[in-house]
Amino acid sequence: MNVLSCSINTLIKEGLYEISGVEVGQHFYWQIGGFQVHAQVLITSWVVIAILLGSAVLVVRNPQTIPTDGQNFFEFVLEFIRDVSKTQIGEEYGPWVPFIGTLFLFIFVSNWSGALLPWKIIQLPQGELAAPTNDINTTVALALLTSVAYFYAGLSKKGLGYFSKYIQPTPILLPINILEDFTKPLSLSFRLFGNILADELVVVVLVSLVPLVVPIPVMFLGLFTSGIQALIFATLAAAYIGESMEGHH
């Protein structure tokens, strides 16, 4: 157990700090206190948030009894997110719809912005812009939020009895069950980061090697896989929350 505790502490103190320093492309930073902040991630994240908030305001500003095209689309998205949440969490899915929906929409729009918006042609004094999910810090932050959410879900329903899951079905599995909770955010973050990074790199390489028209099918494939990655992340987040509330694996 001492070895396991030391390994976990080393991962938290050193491993995650080193992961946050992973760079792809040219970055620029803001100095806030004693920390260097990836400024391009904040800028593009604000753009994505502004798109989501602006779209929501336009739709709900004047709701119609007979929905318009925009209202129809957002109602469809809401029903889709509700279905995903109910399927994975169960009958107590209601309070978690906003969280799952926010994850899905933020990741979806972030991924698509990387494929559709020409971030890299915007001239900066140093560095370049890219999709928020093209940065490991964003995906790790989203994964850690998911971890906090499923711990909160389990504790709020079962209290301290939630931790009994670590010794089920036998106390021998305690180290493995603890390790599982650390691998969940890692798998979520690296899956999303790796897929979005790969999509962008493939498009950049093809555009540099062949005429502009040829990479278009690959770009459409990237849009499809970007949407799938957003759905996978949101579905797994809902599944983890449902699992923590039900206490099964």
UniProtKB/Swiss-Prot annotation:
Subcellular location: Plastid, Chloroplast thylakoid membrane
Gene Ontology CC terms: chloroplast thylakoid membrane; plasma membrane; proton-transporting ATP synthase complex
Membrane spanning residue stretches: 40-60, 97-117, 136-156, 201-221, 222-242
GO molecular function: proton-transporting ATP synthase activity, rotational mechanism
Keywords, sorted A to Z: ATP synthesis, CF(0), Chloroplast, Hydrogen ion transport, Ion transport, Membrane, Plastid, Thylakoid, Transmembrane, Transmembrane helix, Transport
Main location: plastid
Protein task: Key component of the proton channel; it plays a direct role in the translocation of protons across the membrane.
Record-given protein name: ATP synthase subunit a, chloroplastic
Organism (species): Aethionema grandiflorum
Lineage of source species: Eukaryota, Viridiplantae, Streptophyta, Embryophyta, Tracheophyta
UniProt gene name: atpI
